[in-house]
Amino acid sequence: MTAVTNLYKLDWNDDIDAELGEKVLYNENATLQDLLDSNLCKLTFVGQSKARSGVKKDKTKTLTDLASSATGRAIDKALAKLQVDHEAFRTIVPVSKCADGYVYARIGTKEGVTTGDEYEILEQQLNPKTKKIEYKKVGSAKVEDNEIWFNTSGADELIANAEEAEAAEMKKAQELGYTKFKSDKKDYSGYYLRLKKKKGKIED
């Protein structure tokens, strides 16, 4: 299966926000057609990515289910590639917990995480002037080897098709429920992570 993913940016500013609110959002009689006719929601093309994933064998599942899982994996890879190439599209994820110089987050192979990837640790702040949420870098973290959550779409099928030793490792990684990052010994509970530098390759 091959997934082609296009990334668009919504053109937006305070003037558009105010006009849309007046014409549509705060108008009780407004309809979806009014939103379309307002011509306020415009998109700018940012980039494109492609990724492939093979259909695995599994006698316990239908071909439709297997094809669906392969499609999901291809889409996940394509989205992960877009995040690497376009900083504004990078997901900000909450830190799940901190302990002994490590931070943990519920992201993994589905999001394209690989060993050695570098992440920023961010603090959420309210800008007193704009009243908008901003994120300030307060630290760094690096993905630990063999501590990456195996949450890939159709993970059970991949495990079923792997050799015994590899399948055992994949199963162990699947049961982690988190990815482990090396950081300093500060308490980053309530903070966030965002990809800074990609070290590993997202395989097709």
Where are these regions (language model features)?
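Surface-exposed, polar/charged interaction patches used for macromolecular assembly or partner binding
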Residues: 1-204
